[in-house]
Amino acid sequence: MGNIKKNGNIREASCDEELRAMRDCLFIIGGKWKLLILRYLANRQHLELNYTKILQDIGGISPKVLIKELKDLEQNQLICRKQNNDKVPKVFYSLSGYGKTVIPLTEAIVQWGLDHRSKITE
């Protein structure tokens, strides 16, 4: 069970509260692409990643969908969008501090996926 922190007190979440929390989570990071984008950015934190690079590296995502997903992730404060001041401005994307809190979740999903693939191909 999860825990709820409120007014300095911690209590165990009810089943209904846990299900609501899962719905909230899936609303923000669910779908086909958001977790992939977050994991991609997490694995490349030392690089400057622009839209074109992300589009090239994450196979199968359309330009229109990538733009929408990046906007959604930025709106939910999971990624940062930074524009340089060069003559030809470039925009770079990275995980925000808050977005880094999703890294353990993506790691768990990756491991589960690897384990599952091994299990079904035995």
Q: What are these model-predicted stretches?
A:
Residues 1-8, 56-67, 119:
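Membrane-interacting alpha-helical segments
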Residues 16, 84-85:
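Short loop/turn motifs at secondary-structure junctions and domain boundaries
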Residues 50, 82, 121-122:
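Short, hydrophobic secondary-structure boundary micro-motifs
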Residues 52-81, 88:
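Canonical helix-turn-helix DNA-binding module
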Residues 85-106:
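Basic, amphipathic "hinge/linker" alpha-helix immediately C-terminal to the N-terminal HTH DNA-binding motif
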Residues 1-29:
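N-terminal leader segment of winged-helix/HTH proteins
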Residues 2-8, 19, 39, 103-122:
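Amphipathic alpha-helical dimerization/coiled-coil segments
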Residues 20-64:
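N-terminal helix-turn-helix DNA-binding core of bacterial DNA-binding proteins
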